[in-house]
Structures are given as structure tokens and as C-alpha cells.
């Protein structure tokens, strides 16, 4: 922690106290307190983060010090601002970008996000005199985690290995379409004892730019590579996928061998965008009807009804044959997902699995939670540009509920993978 204070001749200079002092991992909470204020002093706390492309994310909240001139965000409710009430991590999850339709993304996991925290005198909207300042670093790689770029055959990926010699249970991590290679979820999970491969599948290096056809053999090659790695347990791998990555998780579990466990975050059970192909089998894309795209009062597109119902007519051919799978599934669902009908897809997948005598999957539904369920304390992305439909679309979610869901989902998926990949049986109740 680096703390800077503005001297006040009438009392000790206010100081921001952060624990842990030296920064922490991005999925961990930070304890924020202020000392040296006047008794009952009104102050405004402000947080600022600059992302890798220079966009600023900000939040602020109004507080009142206690009778000793101290302020502890774990005990003191915010009186208003970006959030209100007792929210110890609100200055992080309530951040909003200064650019429209901007999502917080971490490309270089070897450097931290840096958050500047300021204490301002009073409750004025424009902020009073700055009383104290601190800098907090949020890291993406735990000490000892190793980052290994993978360019093996066609596979374009990055493997993150925990400290030690292993072997460790392996997980393949997939993001949505157009993401390229995103590593921040894999790097954090590697700190929990998993060997995690962040796998790109389009829009990266020499991989296809479009998604006209997806060959599952590419993903099979990635599974083979991971299972053959000397530091990965060889019995089977897990798959973690969100959005299009969740849909691909369904496909891998349905067509490929050695997929022991899959966590699907807001994924589709029908194939979307282009043909899905494995050997001599082809699953066509579900149809769309652009007339069903709605407009919000702000002029943004709401595409939740864009896709045809995969249970009707010729669109039934777009269904991924999940009933073939012997994989253990966990479905994490944002009930306010406006990208597509994630809860419907999860429940339909569950019906099809059970109708074929397969294990009932675990479904956890999070109210007021949108499409992009990230690791804990990432701010909600309310809307951003969607290259497939053109222009900005809404993703759904309310900031506080979405933030609480991210904390719970992160714990749930870790527990699920430990149970199914390395035999550490335990359960945690969903908190929502």
C-alpha cells in the first residue's frame, strides 16, 4: 500500500488503511478504512481505475466518520453515491466507465489493475478538498503461478500452472465469440490448484476471423494436449465456458471424450452463428429474426428474442445433442441475461439429460444478474458493442445483485471442479 496524506494543522492527517497492504488478487476483497478524520466528519470516497486502453472507471460514495474520527467500510454504510448501504467492496464493483458501451477487460495478466482511492472532505457532488489518497493493486497471478504460451499444432492457448510439481486437474477455459485470447479467469483459477488452459478459437493470430464453421477437432486437439501434459492428471478435463464458450462447452461434452465436468455460464444449448462440425456430423445454426430485436428507451438494442426457439420446426436441428454426454454439469444462470434465454437453455438441457437417464445437472439461477458473469468484483457491463448484430446491446443485470452473484458463482464453480476433477468432495450452499 502507498498512502499519501494532506496535512491538516488541527489534527493528525487522515490516512487510508488498506488490508492486505501490498495489494491482493483480483478475486479477493480488500479491507478499506480511514483514520484521522474529525468526529462525525462527512467525507466522500472515490475510486478510479484506468484500464489498458486508457478508459477510466470510477465510483464514489458518501460516508460519515464515527465519534472517533474513523471510518471502516466493513462496518459503516454508504449514505449514497454509486451505491448505498453496507457494501465493503462497492467502490470496486460499482465502478462505471467514462466511455459509453465499455467493458472492463484484462489482457495482460502479468500486470495488476491499479485502483486509486481518494478521501474528499464533505458530500459535495464535485468533491471537496482531498484529505488522503492510497493506491491499491489487484493482481491476476498468485505467487508461483506459471504462464506458458501454447502453440502446438493448431492450438493457440495459454496454460497456467499452479505452484509445485502436480499433477493438477486440468480445465479448458472458453470466453465468448470475438474475445480472442482472454487469460484473466484462467490465471486466477490456476491459483486455486488447477492447470487451466485459456483457449482461443477465433479472432486471434492465425485462427479464423469468422465463425461460419466450427470444427470440434480443434477443441479435441486442445483436450489431447492438456491430458498429455506431465503436470496434468490424465483421467479427464473440465471445461469452463461463458456465452459462446458455454455453447462450445455443451458441444465438447456432447461429442468429445474425456470431458469429466463442465461449468456452463449463460450458455446456449442450440448452435448459434455458423455450422458446428465434428467428423461427419454437422449441427446447423438456429435461425434468427431481426424483427424481434427491441430498442430500449436509450436507443440500445435488446436482442434477447433474436433467436428462434430451438424446440420448434426446423430449428430443432440446431440443438446440441447434450443427451449423449456423460459429463457432470453445473449451469450458472443470470436470470436477467439479455443476450439470450440462458435459463430456458439450462432447464432444457437438464430435461434432455434426465430423459436419457443421465445425472441431473446442478442449476444455480441468480436474480437480477446479466450475461457477463465475471470473477468477483468486476464491475457490471450494462451495455457494449456487439459485432454480430452491429451497435451496442444491453446485457442485463443490476449492479449490486450482479456483484453478489459473481462472488457466489466463483466459489460454486471452484467447488464443483474440485469435487469432480480431484475428488475433494464438499458443497457450499448458493447464497442467492
From Swiss-Prot:
Residue window of motif Microbody targeting signal: 430-432
Keyword Metal-binding part of the UniProt annotation: no
InterPro entries with a match to the protein in the record: AB_hydrolase_fold, Acyl-CoA_thioEstase_long-chain, BAAT_C, Thio_Ohase/aa_AcTrfase, Thio_Ohase/BAAT_N
Known pathway: Lipid metabolism; fatty acid metabolism
Keywords: Fatty acid metabolism, Hydrolase, Lipid metabolism, Peroxisome, Serine esterase
Catalyzed reactions: hexadecanoyl-CoA + H2O = hexadecanoate + CoA + H(+); decanoyl-CoA + H2O = decanoate + CoA + H(+); dodecanoyl-CoA + H2O = dodecanoate + CoA + H(+); tetradecanoyl-CoA + H2O = tetradecanoate + CoA + H(+)
S-S pairs: none
Entry comment describing in which tissues the protein is expressed: Widely expressed. Highly expressed in the kidney, expressed at low level in the liver. Isoform 2 is expressed in the kidney, but not in the liver. Isoform 1 is liver-specific. Highly expressed in kidney (at protein level).
UniProt-annotated catalytic positions: 243 (charge relay system), 337 (charge relay system), 371 (charge relay system)
Family: Belongs to the C/M/P thioester hydrolase family.
Keyword Lipid metabolism in record: yes
Stimuli inducing this protein: In the liver and kidney, by peroxisome proliferator (such as Clofibrate) treatment, via the peroxisome proliferator-activated receptors (PPARs) or fasting for 24 hours.
Domain of life: Eukaryota
Primary location group: other
Compartments where located: Peroxisome
GO MF term set: carboxylic ester hydrolase activity; fatty acyl-CoA hydrolase activity
Annotated EC: 3.1.2.2
Species of provenance: Mus musculus (Mouse)
Enzyme class, UniProt record, top EC level: hydrolase
Protein name: Acyl-coenzyme A thioesterase 3
GO biological process: acyl-CoA metabolic process; long-chain fatty acid metabolic process; saturated monocarboxylic acid metabolic process; unsaturated monocarboxylic acid metabolic process; very long-chain fatty acid metabolic process
Gene Ontology CC terms: cytosol; peroxisome
Role played: Catalyzes the hydrolysis of acyl-CoAs into free fatty acids and coenzyme A (CoASH), regulating their respective intracellular levels. Mainly active on long-chain acyl-CoAs. May have a function in termination of beta-oxidation of fatty acids.
